[in-house]
Amino acid sequence: DVAIVDTSADGVTVETPPSLDPSRRSARITLDNAAVTVLAGGATALRDLNRVILSADAVGIAAECTESAAAYANEREQFGRPIAMFQAVKHHCANVAAATEKATCAVWDAARAASTGGDQLSYAAAVAATLAAPAADLCANLSTQVHGGIAITWEHDAHLYMRRSSVLLGHLDADAAARDLTDLVRRGVTREKAIELPPEAEAIRDEVRAFAERIK
């Protein structure tokens, strides 16, 4: 179940504790005989939607860190050439790009499933939550390494992304999401693999079908 509380009501105390992520508000709520509205059976839907929203936040961090790391690697020179030419830096940039793309695909699918609800949403949201926060954390950390010393200054934004990704790791709990996904699979739940495309895409589909027939 889900309990909805009016934070301005009697018996409700709201405190703002310090947070690792200063860019996002946090609160500690204390209830003392406060009135609540209970949404029976709403916990699963709330959990799933929370996973979709926070996973989208996480892939946004991953994408920004990936883009900024690649851009910096191409402009920063060391030993007379851009650091993007060094194998170790290339590997970092490739790893963050791969993690970002994989998590982004999962989050897009979870967002599509939000209108469906039920087990389809639970499945897609669990996949997104399993991938997104770890991807954000990886990208924030490797982006910091690519940027080098400038990234550990207060003036640079890298520490903000590291803070947000660290907090999201706790909020999303990828391990719990993976366990929920395993339970769904054991129950026989699978994700529908159809993708809705606009009408103008049908002509392209015909071309693809014809090409597939030719190369069989």
Where are each of the predicted segments found?
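Conserved catalytic-core motifs characterized by acidic clusters
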Residues: T37-R47, A73-Q87, Q145, G149, ...
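Oxyanion-binding "anion nests"
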Residues: S55-A84, H91-H92, V96-T100, T104
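FAD-binding core of flavoproteins
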Residues: D1-E67, A71, R191-A203
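DHp/HisKA dimerization-phosphoacceptor four-helix bundle of two-component histidine kinases
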Residues: L54-D57, A88-H91, N95-A98, V127-P134, ...
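C-terminal helix-coil-helix/basic helical segment that borders enzyme active sites and/or dimer interfaces
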Residues: A70, Q78-R81, A97-L131, Q145-H147, ...
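Glycine-rich phosphate/cofactor-binding loops in nucleotide/flavin-utilizing enzymes
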Residues: G149-R209
